[in-house]
Structures are given as structure tokens and as C-alpha cells.
Amino acid sequence: GALWIIGNEGVNKPTWEAVNHGWWTGVDSDVCLTPIKDKVYQVTLTVGKQLRATDVNFKFFGQANWGIEFKGQDNSHLISTDSEVFGIGDGNGHDNGNVYLKDGVELKDGETYVLTVDLTAGVDKAVLKVEKK
């Protein structure tokens, strides 16, 4: 399996400016996370390159297209996080399942974040872990 990021024009690889589509789908537009072990996926994003410092807004999908998506509530595929940097919308004023920058957090160009999605407990108990490098 694979896990994909689909989001606004502020997240992409090799740079968000080079692939500035915003919520387009397909392998040419979306970011595929790397499987690092069974049911665990990872992506590294550098602020100012692959991730814009403001207006963070993306979500995780089970394919490079609309379909299976991870949400914060009321869905068969659920994701949560205890990150102090990023939150996941779950009826808290952010779209259900969308990753956003938490209030009061400021990203700086050059900072690098490793995002790991762990599905080992099941697709209804996915966990996003965030590590600043």
C-alpha cells in the first residue's frame, strides 16, 4: 500500500513553488510518503522548500486521487496527533482530517519536519508523529 498527501499549493516536492497546483490529484501532483516499515509511512518536509511557512492545509489519502481519506472524526479511516506544531481537523474549526498549523506556532524557513504516519493499530487508529530535525 501507499499513503499520499493531497493539499493546498503550500505543500509538494521537490518544491511547493515548482508544483503549485493546490488540491490537484494524481501522481504528478501529490506527495507519496515512503514506507519505512510495514504500515508505517514517512515524509520529510523543509519549510520554505516543500512546505510553506503559513497556510498549512493538507490531508492524507490512501491513493493519489480522491477516495480513501483519513479524517479526524466520523470516518472509517481516522487519524490523530499529539503534535505541538500541527493539528488535525476534527470539528475544531478546521476541515475534518486536514492538517493545519496550531495557533501560536510559527514555522521558519529552513526548519525540517519528519512526518510519520503509523497505521499498525489499524486504519481507524492512525497516528501522525511529528519530529523537528
What is each residue range found by the language model?
Residues 123-133:
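Short, low-complexity, Pro/Ser/Thr/Gly-rich segments in the mature regions of secreted, periplasmic
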Residues 1-52, 63-86:
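Aromatic-rich carbohydrate-binding modules that target alpha-glucans
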Residues 50-55, 110:
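Extended extracellular/luminal ectodomain segments enriched in beta-structured repeat modules
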Residues 42-44, 57, 114-116:
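Beta-strand secondary-structure signal
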Residues 38-39, 122-124:
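Beta-strand-connecting loop/turn residues
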Residues 67-122:
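Structured interaction patches on ligand/partner-binding surfaces of diverse proteins
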Residues 59-61:
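Extracellular recognition modules
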